[in-house]
Protein backbone atom coordinates (compact mmCIF):
# COMPACT_ATOMS: atom_id res chain seq x y z
CA UNK A 1 0.00 0.00 0.00
CA UNK A 2 1.44 3.40 -0.98
CA UNK A 3 -1.70 5.42 -1.69
CA UNK A 4 -3.14 7.34 1.26
CA UNK A 5 -6.60 7.42 -0.32
CA UNK A 6 -6.88 3.71 0.49
CA UNK A 7 -6.85 4.64 4.19
CA UNK A 8 -9.63 7.22 4.29
CA UNK A 9 -12.41 5.78 6.46
CA UNK A 10 -15.91 5.26 5.13
CA UNK A 11 -17.41 6.65 8.32
CA UNK A 12 -16.10 4.69 11.30
CA UNK A 13 -13.37 5.05 13.88
CA UNK A 14 -11.96 1.61 13.20
CA UNK A 15 -9.06 2.43 10.86
CA UNK A 16 -6.21 0.60 12.59
CA UNK A 17 -3.76 -0.87 10.09
CA UNK A 18 -0.58 -2.89 10.50
CA UNK A 19 2.59 -1.68 8.74
CA UNK A 20 6.22 -2.70 8.57
CA UNK A 21 8.40 -0.04 10.19
CA UNK A 22 11.13 1.71 8.23
CA UNK A 23 13.14 2.93 11.21
CA UNK A 24 12.35 2.85 14.92
CA UNK A 25 8.93 4.31 15.68
CA UNK A 26 8.05 5.80 19.07
CA UNK A 27 4.64 5.08 20.60
CA UNK A 28 2.15 7.90 20.05
CA UNK A 29 4.24 9.71 17.47
CA UNK A 30 3.07 10.64 13.95
CA UNK A 31 4.46 8.67 11.02
CA UNK A 32 4.60 8.95 7.24
CA UNK A 33 3.84 6.45 4.48
CA UNK A 34 6.95 5.73 2.39
CA UNK A 35 7.02 4.98 -1.32
CA UNK A 36 7.63 1.34 -0.40
CA UNK A 37 4.38 1.22 1.58
CA UNK A 38 6.05 1.22 5.00
CA UNK A 39 5.57 3.41 8.05
CA UNK A 40 8.46 5.72 8.95
CA UNK A 41 9.02 8.30 11.69
CA UNK A 42 8.97 11.96 10.74
CA UNK A 43 12.58 13.14 10.60
CA UNK A 44 14.87 15.80 9.23
CA UNK A 45 18.20 15.46 7.46
CA UNK A 46 20.84 17.63 5.79
CA UNK A 47 22.78 16.87 2.63
CA UNK A 48 24.90 18.71 0.09
CA UNK A 49 25.75 17.96 -3.50
CA UNK A 50 29.16 18.29 -5.13
CA UNK A 51 29.96 21.97 -5.79
CA UNK A 52 29.91 23.04 -9.43
CA UNK A 53 32.12 25.76 -10.94
CA UNK A 54 30.42 28.82 -12.42
CA UNK A 55 33.71 30.44 -13.55
CA UNK A 56 37.43 29.82 -13.72
CA UNK A 57 38.56 28.25 -10.44
CA UNK A 58 40.11 30.78 -8.05
CA UNK A 59 39.34 33.83 -10.17
CA UNK A 60 35.97 35.18 -8.96
CA UNK A 61 35.49 37.67 -6.14
CA UNK A 62 32.66 39.88 -4.89
CA UNK A 63 30.34 36.94 -5.50
CA UNK A 64 26.61 37.58 -5.27
CA UNK A 65 23.60 35.43 -6.11
CA UNK A 66 19.86 35.92 -6.65
CA UNK A 67 16.92 33.70 -7.54
CA UNK A 68 14.74 34.65 -10.51
CA UNK A 69 11.26 33.44 -9.53
CA UNK A 70 9.91 34.11 -13.03
CA UNK A 71 12.51 32.07 -14.94
CA UNK A 72 13.05 29.64 -12.03
CA UNK A 73 16.80 30.16 -12.28
CA UNK A 74 19.75 31.00 -10.05
CA UNK A 75 21.88 33.92 -11.24
CA UNK A 76 25.45 34.37 -9.98
CA UNK A 77 27.35 37.66 -10.34
CA UNK A 78 31.06 38.13 -9.73
CA UNK A 79 34.25 40.04 -10.53
CA UNK A 80 36.36 37.85 -12.81
CA UNK A 81 40.07 38.11 -11.99
CA UNK A 82 40.70 35.83 -14.97
CA UNK A 83 39.17 38.37 -17.36
CA UNK A 84 40.51 41.82 -16.46
CA UNK A 85 38.33 41.97 -13.30
CA UNK A 86 35.21 42.45 -15.43
CA UNK A 87 31.74 42.16 -13.95
CA UNK A 88 30.35 38.81 -15.05
CA UNK A 89 27.18 36.74 -14.60
CA UNK A 90 25.95 33.22 -15.30
CA UNK A 91 22.54 31.53 -15.08
CA UNK A 92 22.23 28.29 -13.12
CA UNK A 93 19.61 25.54 -13.14
CA UNK A 94 19.17 23.44 -10.00
CA UNK A 95 18.41 19.72 -10.28
CA UNK A 96 18.37 17.74 -7.07
CA UNK A 97 21.50 18.76 -5.19
CA UNK A 98 23.39 19.80 -8.32
CA UNK A 99 23.44 22.86 -10.52
CA UNK A 100 24.47 23.50 -14.14
CA UNK A 101 25.43 26.85 -15.64
CA UNK A 102 25.02 28.51 -18.99
CA UNK A 103 27.71 30.61 -20.68
CA UNK A 104 29.13 33.47 -18.61
CA UNK A 105 28.16 36.98 -19.77
CA UNK A 106 30.07 40.22 -19.05
CA UNK A 107 27.89 43.04 -17.73
CA UNK A 108 30.67 45.61 -17.12
CA UNK A 109 33.92 45.70 -19.12
CA UNK A 110 36.01 47.30 -16.38
CA UNK A 111 37.13 46.52 -12.83
CA UNK A 112 33.90 45.70 -10.99
CA UNK A 113 33.81 45.49 -7.18
CA UNK A 114 31.34 45.79 -4.29
CA UNK A 115 28.76 43.79 -6.28
CA UNK A 116 25.26 43.47 -4.81
CA UNK A 117 22.22 42.07 -6.62
CA UNK A 118 18.50 41.57 -6.11
CA UNK A 119 15.49 40.34 -8.08
CA UNK A 120 12.68 42.72 -9.05
CA UNK A 121 9.61 40.48 -8.89
CA UNK A 122 7.43 43.18 -10.43
CA UNK A 123 9.49 43.67 -13.60
CA UNK A 124 10.90 40.10 -13.51
CA UNK A 125 14.42 41.46 -13.84
CA UNK A 126 17.66 41.22 -11.90
CA UNK A 127 19.17 44.47 -10.61
CA UNK A 128 22.92 44.54 -9.97
CA UNK A 129 24.68 47.43 -8.23
CA UNK A 130 28.46 47.78 -8.25
CA UNK A 131 31.49 50.05 -8.03
CA UNK A 132 32.77 50.77 -11.55
CA UNK A 133 36.57 51.01 -11.59
CA UNK A 134 36.41 52.14 -15.21
CA UNK A 135 34.35 55.22 -14.31
CA UNK A 136 36.06 56.87 -11.32
CA UNK A 137 34.63 54.20 -8.97
CA UNK A 138 31.11 55.59 -9.40
CA UNK A 139 28.17 53.60 -8.11
CA UNK A 140 26.39 51.98 -11.06
CA UNK A 141 23.43 49.66 -11.56
CA UNK A 142 22.30 47.51 -14.45
CA UNK A 143 19.17 45.49 -15.25
CA UNK A 144 19.41 41.87 -16.38
CA UNK A 145 16.89 39.70 -18.24
CA UNK A 146 17.10 35.92 -17.93
CA UNK A 147 16.09 33.81 -20.93
CA UNK A 148 16.66 30.09 -20.72
CA UNK A 149 20.21 29.59 -19.48
CA UNK A 150 21.46 33.01 -20.57
CA UNK A 151 21.18 36.58 -19.35
CA UNK A 152 21.28 39.89 -21.24
CA UNK A 153 21.78 43.36 -19.83
CA UNK A 154 20.47 46.84 -20.51
CA UNK A 155 22.38 50.11 -20.19
CA UNK A 156 24.02 50.90 -16.86
CA UNK A 157 22.94 53.94 -14.84
CA UNK A 158 24.67 55.95 -12.10
CA UNK A 159 23.10 55.84 -8.67
CA UNK A 160 26.00 57.81 -7.16
CA UNK A 161 28.26 59.99 -9.32
CA UNK A 162 31.14 59.75 -6.86
CA UNK A 163 33.39 57.08 -5.40
CA UNK A 164 31.16 54.39 -3.89
CA UNK A 165 31.76 51.28 -1.81
CA UNK A 166 30.13 48.85 0.67
CA UNK A 167 27.02 48.41 -1.47
CA UNK A 168 23.91 46.57 -0.30
CA UNK A 169 20.63 46.14 -2.19
CA UNK A 170 17.10 44.85 -1.62
CA UNK A 171 13.72 44.89 -3.33
CA UNK A 172 10.59 46.43 -1.83
CA UNK A 173 7.77 44.31 -3.28
CA UNK A 174 5.14 46.67 -1.89
CA UNK A 175 6.51 49.81 -3.53
CA UNK A 176 8.03 47.79 -6.42
CA UNK A 177 11.35 49.56 -6.00
CA UNK A 178 14.98 48.54 -5.66
CA UNK A 179 16.71 50.11 -2.65
CA UNK A 180 20.49 50.56 -2.58
CA UNK A 181 22.48 51.42 0.56
CA UNK A 182 26.14 52.36 0.28
CA UNK A 183 29.04 54.33 1.67
CA UNK A 184 29.46 57.57 -0.24
CA UNK A 185 33.21 58.14 -0.39
CA UNK A 186 32.52 61.37 -2.25
CA UNK A 187 30.57 62.71 0.74
CA UNK A 188 32.80 62.05 3.76
CA UNK A 189 31.95 58.31 3.77
CA UNK A 190 28.36 59.00 4.83
CA UNK A 191 25.92 56.10 4.88
CA UNK A 192 23.53 56.82 2.02
CA UNK A 193 20.57 55.19 0.28
CA UNK A 194 18.72 55.66 -2.98
CA UNK A 195 15.56 54.26 -4.61
CA UNK A 196 15.59 52.76 -8.10
CA UNK A 197 12.74 52.12 -10.55
CA UNK A 198 13.07 49.48 -13.26
CA UNK A 199 11.43 50.20 -16.60
CA UNK A 200 12.04 47.79 -19.46
CA UNK A 201 15.75 47.04 -19.44
CA UNK A 202 16.72 50.30 -17.73
CA UNK A 203 16.70 51.74 -14.23
CA UNK A 204 16.36 55.31 -12.94
CA UNK A 205 16.98 56.71 -9.48
CA UNK A 206 15.53 59.26 -7.11
CA UNK A 207 17.62 61.57 -4.97
CA UNK A 208 20.27 60.16 -2.65
CA UNK A 209 19.51 60.46 1.07
CA UNK A 210 22.07 60.08 3.86
CA UNK A 211 21.04 57.95 6.83
CA UNK A 212 24.30 58.66 8.70
CA UNK A 213 26.59 61.68 8.70
CA UNK A 214 29.66 59.55 9.32
CA UNK A 215 31.17 56.28 8.12
CA UNK A 216 29.17 53.07 7.71
CA UNK A 217 29.82 49.67 6.11
CA UNK A 218 28.46 46.11 5.74
CA UNK A 219 25.06 47.28 4.48
CA UNK A 220 22.28 44.76 3.88
CA UNK A 221 18.53 45.12 3.33
CA UNK A 222 15.39 43.00 3.63
CA UNK A 223 11.76 43.81 2.93
CA UNK A 224 9.14 43.54 5.69
CA UNK A 225 5.86 42.98 3.79
CA UNK A 226 3.81 43.07 6.99
CA UNK A 227 4.81 46.63 7.89
CA UNK A 228 5.59 47.61 4.27
CA UNK A 229 9.07 48.71 5.27
CA UNK A 230 12.68 48.00 4.37
CA UNK A 231 14.97 46.88 7.18
CA UNK A 232 18.52 48.18 6.79
CA UNK A 233 21.34 46.72 8.89
CA UNK A 234 24.91 47.96 8.93
CA UNK A 235 28.12 48.39 10.86
CA UNK A 236 28.24 51.94 12.20
CA UNK A 237 31.97 52.64 11.96
CA UNK A 238 31.38 56.17 13.21
CA UNK A 239 29.84 54.86 16.45
CA UNK A 240 32.34 52.32 17.80
CA UNK A 241 31.46 49.94 14.92
CA UNK A 242 28.20 48.96 16.65
CA UNK A 243 25.69 46.75 14.87
CA UNK A 244 22.85 49.07 13.89
CA UNK A 245 19.47 48.83 12.17
CA UNK A 246 17.08 51.32 10.67
CA UNK A 247 13.54 51.00 9.32
CA UNK A 248 13.09 52.69 5.95
CA UNK A 249 9.89 53.90 4.28
CA UNK A 250 9.71 54.07 0.49
CA UNK A 251 7.37 56.64 -1.04
CA UNK A 252 7.62 57.00 -4.78
CA UNK A 253 11.32 57.48 -5.50
CA UNK A 254 12.11 58.83 -2.04
CA UNK A 255 13.29 57.09 1.12
CA UNK A 256 12.79 58.16 4.73
CA UNK A 257 14.47 56.73 7.81
CA UNK A 258 13.32 55.98 11.32
CA UNK A 259 15.42 56.14 14.47
CA UNK A 260 18.51 53.96 14.62
CA UNK A 261 18.33 50.87 16.81
CA UNK A 262 21.57 49.30 18.04
CA UNK A 263 21.39 45.50 18.18
CA UNK A 264 24.99 44.97 19.35
CA UNK A 265 27.14 47.36 21.40
CA UNK A 266 30.43 45.93 20.16
CA UNK A 267 32.54 45.87 17.02
CA UNK A 268 30.15 44.04 14.69
CA UNK A 269 31.17 42.51 11.37
CA UNK A 270 29.37 40.87 8.44
CA UNK A 271 25.91 42.22 9.29
CA UNK A 272 23.22 40.65 7.13
CA UNK A 273 19.43 40.28 7.30
CA UNK A 274 16.52 38.17 6.09
CA UNK A 275 12.79 38.41 6.77
CA UNK A 276 10.89 35.45 8.24
CA UNK A 277 7.44 35.69 6.64
CA UNK A 278 6.00 33.03 8.97
CA UNK A 279 7.08 34.58 12.26
CA UNK A 280 6.83 38.11 10.79
CA UNK A 281 10.28 38.96 12.11
CA UNK A 282 13.61 40.18 10.78
CA UNK A 283 16.55 37.86 11.45
CA UNK A 284 19.95 39.57 11.75
CA UNK A 285 23.11 37.40 11.79
CA UNK A 286 26.53 38.98 12.44
CA UNK A 287 30.02 38.21 13.75
CA UNK A 288 31.55 39.40 17.03
CA UNK A 289 35.28 38.72 17.48
CA UNK A 290 34.80 35.87 15.02
CA UNK A 291 31.85 34.22 16.78
CA UNK A 292 28.67 33.90 14.72
CA UNK A 293 25.59 35.36 16.40
CA UNK A 294 22.02 36.23 15.52
CA UNK A 295 19.11 38.28 16.85
CA UNK A 296 15.42 38.63 16.01
CA UNK A 297 14.00 42.05 15.21
CA UNK A 298 10.38 43.19 15.45
CA UNK A 299 9.36 46.11 13.27
CA UNK A 300 6.69 48.49 14.52
CA UNK A 301 6.05 51.64 12.56
CA UNK A 302 9.44 53.19 11.82
CA UNK A 303 11.23 51.46 14.69
CA UNK A 304 12.66 48.03 15.40
CA UNK A 305 13.37 46.22 18.66
CA UNK A 306 15.51 43.16 19.23
CA UNK A 307 15.41 40.04 21.40
CA UNK A 308 18.34 38.21 23.00
CA UNK A 309 21.20 37.06 20.78
CA UNK A 310 21.93 33.40 20.07
CA UNK A 311 25.18 31.83 18.88
CA UNK A 312 25.50 29.55 15.85
CA UNK A 313 29.30 29.23 15.73
CA UNK A 314 31.70 29.83 18.62
CA UNK A 315 34.80 29.80 16.42
CA UNK A 316 35.85 32.03 13.56
CA UNK A 317 32.93 33.14 11.37
CA UNK A 318 33.26 35.36 8.32
CA UNK A 319 31.53 36.07 5.00
CA UNK A 320 28.07 35.71 6.52
CA UNK A 321 25.01 35.58 4.30
CA UNK A 322 21.43 34.52 5.01
CA UNK A 323 18.19 33.67 3.25
CA UNK A 324 14.74 32.63 4.38
CA UNK A 325 13.60 29.08 3.57
CA UNK A 326 9.83 29.47 3.18
CA UNK A 327 9.22 25.71 3.10
CA UNK A 328 11.17 24.85 6.23
CA UNK A 329 10.24 28.16 7.92
CA UNK A 330 13.88 28.72 8.86
CA UNK A 331 16.47 31.38 8.18
CA UNK A 332 19.60 29.72 6.81
CA UNK A 333 22.92 31.39 7.62
CA UNK A 334 25.98 30.51 5.55
CA UNK A 335 29.48 31.36 6.71
CA UNK A 336 33.17 30.62 6.29
CA UNK A 337 34.90 28.73 9.09
CA UNK A 338 37.64 31.33 9.45
CA UNK A 339 40.16 29.60 11.74
CA UNK A 340 41.58 26.49 10.08
CA UNK A 341 39.87 25.09 6.97
CA UNK A 342 37.95 28.11 5.58
CA UNK A 343 35.27 25.61 4.54
CA UNK A 344 31.72 26.69 3.85
CA UNK A 345 29.10 25.93 6.50
CA UNK A 346 25.38 26.61 6.82
CA UNK A 347 23.02 26.45 9.77
CA UNK A 348 19.24 26.82 10.06
CA UNK A 349 17.71 29.20 12.59
CA UNK A 350 14.14 28.88 13.88
CA UNK A 351 12.32 31.89 15.30
CA UNK A 352 10.05 31.61 18.34
CA UNK A 353 8.66 34.88 19.60
CA UNK A 354 11.62 37.26 19.80
CA UNK A 355 14.22 34.50 20.08
CA UNK A 356 16.07 32.31 17.60
CA UNK A 357 17.64 28.89 18.02
CA UNK A 358 20.09 27.28 15.64
CA UNK A 359 20.43 23.66 14.56
CA UNK A 360 23.51 21.66 13.61
CA UNK A 361 25.75 23.21 10.97
CA UNK A 362 26.25 21.50 7.61
CA UNK A 363 29.68 21.56 5.95
CA UNK A 364 28.45 22.16 2.38
CA UNK A 365 31.88 22.43 0.77
CA UNK A 366 35.54 21.79 1.53
CA UNK A 367 36.54 24.63 -0.80
CA UNK A 368 37.79 27.96 0.49
CA UNK A 369 34.62 30.07 0.58
CA UNK A 370 35.95 33.58 1.02
CA UNK A 371 34.20 36.41 -0.82
CA UNK A 372 34.94 40.10 -0.40
CA UNK A 373 31.32 41.17 -0.22
CA UNK A 374 27.78 40.31 -0.98
CA UNK A 375 24.80 38.13 -0.29
CA UNK A 376 26.03 34.77 -1.56
CA UNK A 377 23.24 32.47 -0.37
CA UNK A 378 19.67 32.20 -1.63
CA UNK A 379 16.71 29.83 -1.39
CA UNK A 380 15.37 28.12 -4.52
CA UNK A 381 11.65 27.59 -3.73
CA UNK A 382 11.05 25.48 -6.84
CA UNK A 383 13.74 22.93 -6.00
CA UNK A 384 13.34 23.48 -2.23
CA UNK A 385 17.11 23.83 -1.90
CA UNK A 386 19.61 26.35 -0.58
CA UNK A 387 22.25 27.63 -3.00
CA UNK A 388 25.55 29.19 -1.93
CA UNK A 389 28.11 30.64 -4.35
CA UNK A 390 31.62 31.59 -3.28
CA UNK A 391 35.05 32.80 -4.36
CA UNK A 392 36.46 29.36 -5.18
CA UNK A 393 34.25 29.56 -8.30
CA UNK A 394 32.03 26.98 -6.72
CA UNK A 395 28.29 26.85 -6.26
CA UNK A 396 26.88 24.36 -3.75
CA UNK A 397 23.29 23.14 -3.57
CA UNK A 398 22.09 21.67 -0.30
CA UNK A 399 19.12 20.73 1.83
CA UNK A 400 19.34 21.78 5.46
CA UNK A 401 17.16 20.19 8.14
CA UNK A 402 14.82 19.00 5.39
CA UNK A 403 11.78 17.06 6.61
CA UNK A 404 10.52 13.82 5.04
CA UNK A 405 6.98 15.01 5.81
CA UNK A 406 5.12 16.36 2.77
CA UNK A 407 1.61 17.65 2.17
CA UNK A 408 0.44 14.18 1.09
CA UNK A 409 2.33 11.49 3.05
CA UNK A 410 1.20 11.86 6.68
CA UNK A 411 -0.08 8.37 7.59
CA UNK A 412 -1.26 8.52 11.18
CA UNK A 413 -0.07 7.92 14.75
CA UNK A 414 1.69 4.84 16.13
CA UNK A 415 -0.51 2.80 18.50
CA UNK A 416 2.64 1.56 20.23
CA UNK A 417 6.40 1.36 19.85
CA UNK A 418 7.60 -0.46 16.71
CA UNK A 419 11.18 -1.63 16.14
CA UNK A 420 12.84 -1.15 12.77
CA UNK A 421 11.61 -3.81 10.25
CA UNK A 422 9.00 -5.08 12.75
CA UNK A 423 5.26 -4.92 12.13
CA UNK A 424 3.01 -2.76 14.28
CA UNK A 425 -0.31 -0.94 14.34
CA UNK A 426 -0.80 2.58 13.04
CA UNK A 427 -3.94 4.52 13.95
CA UNK A 428 -4.73 6.03 10.56
CA UNK A 429 -7.24 8.80 9.83
CA UNK A 430 -10.63 8.22 11.39
CA UNK A 431 -9.17 6.08 14.17
CA UNK A 432 -8.43 6.88 17.82
CA UNK A 433 -4.99 6.88 19.42
CA UNK A 434 -5.14 5.87 23.08
CA UNK A 435 -1.50 6.31 24.13
CA UNK A 436 -1.41 10.09 24.29
CA UNK A 437 -0.72 11.79 27.62
CA UNK A 438 -0.70 15.36 28.84
CA UNK A 439 -3.44 16.53 26.47
CA UNK A 440 -5.78 17.99 29.09
Predicted regions and their residues:
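Blade-edge beta-strand/turn elements of extracellular beta-propeller
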Residues: 101-102, 153-154, 205-206, 257-258, ...
Amino acid sequence: MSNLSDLIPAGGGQNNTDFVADGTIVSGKPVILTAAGKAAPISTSSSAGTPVSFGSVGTPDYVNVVYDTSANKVVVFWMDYGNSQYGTAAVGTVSGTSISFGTAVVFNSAETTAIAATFDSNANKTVTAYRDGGASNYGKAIVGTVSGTSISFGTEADFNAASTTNIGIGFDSTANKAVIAFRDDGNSDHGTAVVGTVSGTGISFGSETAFQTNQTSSHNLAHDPDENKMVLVYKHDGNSSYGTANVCTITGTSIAFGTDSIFKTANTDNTTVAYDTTANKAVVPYAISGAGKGVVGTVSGTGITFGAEAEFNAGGSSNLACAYNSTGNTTVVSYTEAVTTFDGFAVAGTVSGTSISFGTALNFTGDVTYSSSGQNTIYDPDANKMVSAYRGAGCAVYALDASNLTATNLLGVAAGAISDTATGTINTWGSRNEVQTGLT
